[in-house]
Regions:
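C-terminal accessory helical subdomains adjacent to catalytic cores in phosphodiester-
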Residues: 2-8, 28-215
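RecA-like P-loop NTPase motor core
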Residues: 1-27
Length: 215
């Protein structure tokens, strides 16, 4: 996504994100966006891992890049809206049995993030993602459908409440979705976790996205 950001900035932030993405895919032999124009797409959402364990970059440089991307990717109807996973997408697995009332307290150090995929797998009460996903071609039973739906509702509430606690100091669902903007979440992560403790509060952006999109 940062490469995409750099390409758009070559046009002073005024580039066409759909055209840039189409060209990038075509260069790899992927025709998924062939024939698709900007006018065909009304909303764009981007998901990014807060890769602060990257040993090639300082934390300061990582944070500067995230700030730049959040500024550019701030509107789903324009350049797209960016959502950030802390520390990475595998945070969706970092729970005990749902609902996990201790989730609000979970954080991870920068050093632990180097092996976070294994850490999340070992920590999880679930041996796979079957509790939140259907397999390709699966016809779920009514019981599984309800279970998966309920688990996403738990994940949504857990992550949104945690984001609200992080930003506003209130462990409850926010009154407005703007109360937990991605910019505000990032700023509070840096202030409360990254700078003082070299850590991040575990937070997954997919449940937050679902909350915002459905609200």
């Amino acid at each position: 996504i940062y490469d995409l950001y750099n390409e758009l900035m070559e046009y002073d932030g005024g580039g066409d994100i759909v055209s840039v993405m189409r060209e990038r895919l075509a260069a790899r032999g992927d025709s998924a966006l062939s024939g698709i124009r900007s006018s065909d797409i009304s909303e764009i959402f981007l998901f990014f891992d807060y890769d602060f364990h990257n040993s090639q970059l300082s934390v300061g440089e990582i944070n500067r890049r995230v700030e730049d991307m959040l500024a550019l990717f701030a509107d789903e109807t324009e350049n797209g809206k960016l959502y950030i996973n802390y520390p990475m997408i595998e945070s969706i697995r970092y729970t005990k049995y749902l609902p996990d009332r201790d989730y609000v307290r979970y954080a991870v150090s920068r050093e632990q993030c180097r092996d976070f995929k294994r850490l999340a797998r070992d920590f999880s009460a679930y041996g796979s993602l079957d509790h939140i996903l259907f397999k390709d071609g699966e016809t779920p039973t009514k019981e599984k459908y309800i279970r998966v739906k309920d688990n996403w509702e738990y994940l949504k509430r857990m992550n949104v409440c945690k984001a609200n606690l992080l930003v506003n100091g209130v462990d409850a669902m926010p009154a407005e979705k703007s109360d937990i903007s991605q910019q505000a979440i990032f700023e509070r992560q840096v202030l409360l976790y990254v700078k003082p403790d070299d850590s991040v509060a575990i937070l997954n952006s997919f449940p937050v996205f679902i909350y915002e999109y459905m609200k």
